[in-house]
């Protein structure tokens, strides 16, 4: 392999946020594996550490409540690191006992080491077992006072390189007649604008065509809406990124998703693409054409 294989092993107290952590690494482009058996790590690394492998970032959630694994972890990491092709980091997630008990009560789950349902006893036992591993870890994060968003932001801050895209904007258009996009964070209804559908020569075109785009944008309402929209969007985008959100989906809707919403999605994406990692898509742009062709 040309580049070293970077592996982050995620472990820590049960209930401290390992699920949020693995999702955060996935958002950073890591290949992720949840609940990797400790005795399979060496074999797993061997499968990845080949000349034709294109995966260079891996995050593993490992259950390390087995004392036997602690005796092997240092030798495993040392052996794999010494060959010069693997970088290891251990991330340990912790939280105070009070917070962990509260989280277990909230989810109504039993602690995996609890005896007769006594959560605190299970936490105490687990903390004792994991003490050496915590001392071995390069990064320790106390999640006691962190929301899932705060934890995500903390992980991005510690592990994302300056060149990685940790925040992406998806701009999309859609037609209300086909339903709202379920993954949209911000939805803007542009049905108040004049509809090119009623212009014969524009009916079969869409908002990516210059004639339709110009028709939509030449109206005073369009310009006023665009200016007010950008005044709102520009200052809130950094706030979304700061909160640790990995993807923000901005959706524009019109009746059929062919003309007005497409034109606005194109204009807004063009205005934002130089500063943000951005993708634009048009869910229903060709749906009418496909329906006509099938009939």
Swiss-Prot record:
Coiled coil: none annotated. It comes from the Bacteria. Gene3D superfamilies: P-loop containing nucleotide triphosphate hydrolases. Keywords: ATP-binding, GTP-binding, Nucleotide-binding. GTP binds at residues 63-66. SUPFAM superfamilies: P-loop containing nucleoside triphosphate hydrolases. GO terms for molecular function: ATP binding; GTP binding. The keyword Nucleotide-binding applies. Pfam families: PapZ_C, RapZ-like_N. InterPro entries: P-loop_NTPase, RapZ-like, RapZ-like_N, RapZ_C. The keyword Transferase does not apply. ATP binds at residues 12-19. Displays ATPase and GTPase activities. NCBIfam families: PRK05416.1. Belongs to the RapZ-like family. This is Nucleotide-binding protein YjiE. It comes from Lactococcus lactis subsp. lactis (strain IL1403) (Streptococcus lactis). The gene is yjiE.
């Amino acid at each position: 392999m040309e580049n070293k294989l970077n592996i982050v092993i995620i472990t820590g107290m049960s209930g401290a946020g390992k699920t949020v952590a693995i999702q955060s690494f996935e958002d950073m482009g890591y290949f992720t594996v949840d609940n990797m058996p400790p005795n399979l790590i060496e074999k797993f690394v061997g499968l990845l550490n080949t000349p034709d492998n294109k995966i260079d970032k891996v995050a593993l959630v490992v259950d390390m409540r087995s004392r036997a694994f602690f005796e092997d972890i240092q030798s495993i990491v040392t052996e794999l690191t010494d060959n010069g092709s693997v970088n290891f980091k251990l991330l340990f997630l912790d939280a105070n006992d009070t917070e962990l008990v509260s989280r277990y009560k909230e989810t109504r789950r039993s602690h995996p080491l609890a005896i007769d349902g006594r959560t605190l006893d299970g936490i105490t036992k687990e903390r004792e077992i994991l003490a050496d591993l915590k001392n071995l870890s390069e990064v320790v994060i106390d999640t006691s006072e962190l929301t899932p968003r705060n934890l995500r932001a903390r992980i991005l801050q510690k592990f994302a390189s300056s060149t990685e895209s940790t925040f992406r904007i998806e701009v999309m258009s859609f037609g209300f007649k086909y339903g709202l996009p379920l993954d949209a964070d911000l939805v803007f209804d542009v049905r108040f604008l004049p509809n090119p559908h009623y212009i014969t020569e524009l009916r079969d075109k869409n908002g990516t065509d210059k004639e339709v785009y110009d028709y939509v944008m030449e109206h005073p309402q369009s310009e006023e809406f665009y200016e007010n929209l950008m005044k709102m969007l520009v200052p809130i985008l950094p706030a979304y990124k700061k909160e640790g959100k990995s993807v923000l989906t901005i959706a524009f809707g019109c009746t059929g998703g062919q003309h007005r919403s497409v034109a606005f999605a194109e204009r807004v994406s063009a205005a934002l693409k130089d500063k943000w990692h951005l993708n634009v898509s048009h869910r229903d742009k060709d749906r009418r054409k496909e329906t006509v062709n099938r009939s």
